[in-house]
Structure formats: C-alpha cells, structure tokens
UniProtKB/Swiss-Prot annotation:
GO MF: imidazoleglycerol-phosphate dehydratase activity
Chief place of localization: cytoplasm
Phosphoprotein in keyword set: no
InterPro entries: IGPD_sf (IPR038494), ImidazoleglycerolP_deHydtase (IPR000807), ImidazoleglycerP_deHydtase_CS (IPR020565), Ribosomal_Su5_D2-typ_SF (IPR020568)
Any Pfam family matching the protein: IGPD
UniProt key word Cell membrane: no
The organism of origin for this protein: Methylorubrum extorquens (strain PA1) (Methylobacterium extorquens)
Protein name per UniProt: Imidazoleglycerol-phosphate dehydratase
Reaction catalysis annotation: D-erythro-1-(imidazol-4-yl)glycerol 3-phosphate = 3-(imidazol-4-yl)-2-oxopropyl phosphate + H2O
Pathway(s) annotated for this protein in UniProt: Amino-acid biosynthesis; L-histidine biosynthesis; L-histidine from 5-phospho-alpha-D-ribose 1-diphosphate: step 6/9
Amino acid sequence: MRTASISRRTAETDVSVSIDLDGTGKATIATGVGFLDHMLELFARHGLFDVTIKVEGDLHVDQHHTTEDAGIALGQAVAQALGDKRGIARYADIHLPMDETLSRIAIDISGRPFLVFRTSFRVEKIGQFDTELVREFFQAFAMNAGITLHVETLYGENAHHIAESIFKGLARSLRKAVAIDPREDGRVPSTKGSL
C-alpha cells in the first residue's frame, strides 16, 4: 500500500497528515482555515487520494504558517508514500477549466524540487484567505514532495475559480503521475535508475 503519515510540530503549528495514494477521494480536513479546507477537499476528491489533515496553528497571528505547514506536511507525506517510485508514470500534465478560468499544471516526480508559478490574482483576499498564500502552499508542497511543478493560469477573472482550477489541476495531474504504469514492470522511470 502506498500510504504515509506525517506529524510535524513547531512553535507555530501542530500538523498531522495521512495519505493513501490509491484511495477513493475521501477527505477529513480541519485546518481552521475554511478556504484552505475547501481546496484540500478538492485535492483529495480529484486526485482520488484518501487524505486526513489536521492543523492547529497560530491563527491569532494570521493564516500563513497554517497554510505553509499544511503544504510542507502534505508534500512530505506524498514523498514518503511514493517510496522508491518504482513503476510510476512520473510525468503528467493537464489543462483544467473552471468556468471562465483555464489553468495548466505539469508535474515531474523527479526528486528535484522546483516550482514555476505563473498565476496571479486581481484581489488580495478570497473571503478571509490571503491570495498570496496559494503560492506559499504550492511552494511548500513541491519542495517537500520532491517534485518539479509548473502552475500557470492562462486566463481567468474570478479569484476563487483561479485557485480552484490550480488545486484541481494539481490533484488531477498528480493522480496521473503517481499512477502505476504496468509497462514499467516495476522499474524506476529514469535512465539513472533512481529518482
């Protein structure tokens, strides 16, 4: 089974994450940040990952540490669940529409963490959620999952739709990239023999 559980405690947050990469999309999310919960529920559902995330953070300060640390722990859980990455598809991409918005997400489960983030928001907040935290989440996730991640919104107006399109796009492309490719016959998908 490709599962993992991560616990991470700092002076700012206490985070626990579990993931099953071969799940059915069940989500139990409680970060204390409503919009982030919504995005993480979308991530689980569209990735068909079973995900549990609980965060107790310093929300009296702001939502930054909670959002970033959720991304760190989720990324670590994905990396751990992938193990040596034998048999995975490795690469995936998707164009994901959400009403007037279209975003493109591309992933390489390379072991070389990198983020290209070409998405912007016309407003500073979605409800009470700072839109700049969307990038912080993706940065934390990519660095800790050990993936190369390209996120680009080609066009869009509504900030909620833009955020939703890239979270769903991450889920759908990650779902394809972590899928077991029977033609790999259990090999690591790299000429180097390791990722």
